[in-house]
Amino acid sequence: MKVVMDSDSLIKLTRAKIKEIVVENLDVYIPPKVFEETVTIPKKEGFPDAFLIEENLDKGLLTIGESNADQHVEEMITSLGIGYGESDVFKLYKSGGFDIISSDDRKFLKIIDALGIPYLTPTALIVYLFNKKVLTKENTIDYLNNIKDIVSDEEYYLARKEVE
């Protein structure tokens, strides 16, 4: 599955200690603004997540994708009020060839849901890997517990219910 991921999702999966498994089992792309938000700026501030994400890029497990957004897509971004990093995610997805967007930004998810764009939240990605038999039930619960404090209670409990 070919995924365009935003900063929020990438950071949450990193903190859940499952990002490595995600990037090894899915074809994950991030746009330049997400790279800036998750690597360039945080590295300068000494955040360890940034170094882990950069390592995945260096190993080819994560790809920076460039979009060729047309004027129509740019107008959609402006009229829908899509934010900084998410605008790059949206442009990359609309450039074609991607299956889903991974995000946990509520406002962005409402917009892409209304547009019929498929998406998975970080917890849903973990459950997806469980359903694909990449993760055991025990591993899945451990990863969900790792992410519990940084996702909504609803997200967490829905994901747990899917696994049990």
Enumerate the language-model features and the residues they cover.
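Active-site-proximal, substrate-binding regions of enzyme catalytic domains
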Residues: M1-G96, R106-L109, D113-I117, E155-E164
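Conserved SAM-binding loop
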Residues: I101-S102
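Acidic, PIN/NYN-like endoribonuclease modules and their adjacent C-terminal/linker elements
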Residues: L109-E164
